[in-house]
Amino acid sequence: MSEKAFVTVTALTKYIKRKFDVDPHLEDIWIKGELSNVKIHSRGHVYFTLKDENARMQAVMFQRSAAKLPFSPKSGMKVFVRGGIQVYEPSGNYQLYAKEMQPDGVGALHLAYEELKKKLASEGLFDARYKKPIPEYPEVVGVITSPTGAAVRDVITTINRRYQQAKIIVLPALVQGEHATRSIVERIKEANEKQLCDVLIVGRGGGSIEELWAFNEEAVARAIFASDIPIISAVGHETDFTISDFTADMRAPTPTGAAELAVPSTTDLIERIKSIDIRLTRAVKNQTSQAKDRLLALQSSYAFRFPKRLQEQKEQQFDLVFDRFQKQLTRQIEQKRSQLDRQTYRLKPLHPKEQLLQAKKRHANETEQLIRSMNVQMKTIHSQFQSVLGKLNALNPLQVMERGYSLAYKEDELIKSVNQVETKDQLTITMKDGRLICEVIEKEGQSS
């Protein structure tokens, strides 16, 4: 067999892949099936198997598409998947590269309902702390519903029967179909912006989940939550629960029930007024009877029979109390005065004037002591000075001259020996009262 009769696995796989790539029916296709082996990668990619009763195929949805899904894919879900079929060359298998995914049929609505309910609950839109109280006696009741349905007739009839004082404003809105969500949201905003009423009833009669779906839309739920006017939700029958029921300030099982919650019953109010009137009449009678008994008791009392004597007794009691008070006050004043004197005595040494006086006394004493000490020291110094002066005088040449001695100088040099002079030397003789200029005629004494 020639080599041309054979192809490689790679070549065949590439050939098949090209066939898939150029087929317009496989490039963008919707496939219905059941999810199986769903695995969500850490990077956000979703790998799964799409199957029915007779076949299965591998599929992948990359993170950029998976991030847009309004729900979390799980095994067992019936879904519609949109994407393209391509061949994965390494394994030779074909697989679906998914771009969109939607739950199948009614199951999709239930899934979307649960997903939105979970989302809004996590944001706190259902929390009781945000619920506004329904006014007890509203003057104006607003009704957002279809103007031609049975629901609006039931609400109007019930309010007129129960509480004719309330004015009813019907804000007509679409309650099913493609434009119902926008219509309901606009009516809620209009009622708030124009402050049309004291309480709002938002709802409709019963129907299938598809017909009631506008009240499960996120936009309607958020408009109800944002409303400043308290809202009563009344959608469908008693067993029907919508997202609007959870975000509303109060939920009614039916439109008729909403009307009963919105306004009080005039009959009930009349009965309540009658009951209050009976209780008030009985209370007034009881209080009047008790007051009459107290008055009779007072009239028969000692004070009414002998008022002057009672006055005299009270005056005596007042005098006694006044005397005790005066004595106690005097005693307290004396105690306070004694305490003040003691405090004054203790504080006197601390008074600046007293401290200044004491400082002056200390200064005078210290000055006197300093003067005495200085006098003693001066006397001692004077005595020492006289002693030193006497010694100095004893050594003073002038003092020696006073006793008849003189000093001889040769050219300003004191002559202490005859050996310092020669015959005919000129000498200066200093005496106590002057000097003599002499010439040596002869010298006597021992020569050195």
Curated annotation (Swiss-Prot):
Coiled coil: none annotated. The keyword Cytoplasm applies. It comes from the Bacteria. GO terms for cellular component: cytoplasm; exodeoxyribonuclease VII complex. GO terms for biological process: DNA catabolic process. CDD domains: ExoVII_LU_OBF. Its EC number is 3.1.11.6. It catalyses: Exonucleolytic cleavage in either 5'- to 3'- or 3'- to 5'-direction to yield nucleoside 5'-phosphates. Transmembrane segments: none annotated. GO terms for molecular function: exodeoxyribonuclease VII activity; nucleic acid binding. InterPro entries: Exonuc_VII_L, Exonuc_VII_lsu_C, OB-fold_nuc-bd_dom. Pfam families: Exonuc_VII_L, tRNA_anti_2. Belongs to the XseA family. This is Exodeoxyribonuclease 7 large subunit. The lineage of its organism: Bacteria, Bacillati, Bacillota, Bacilli, Bacillales.
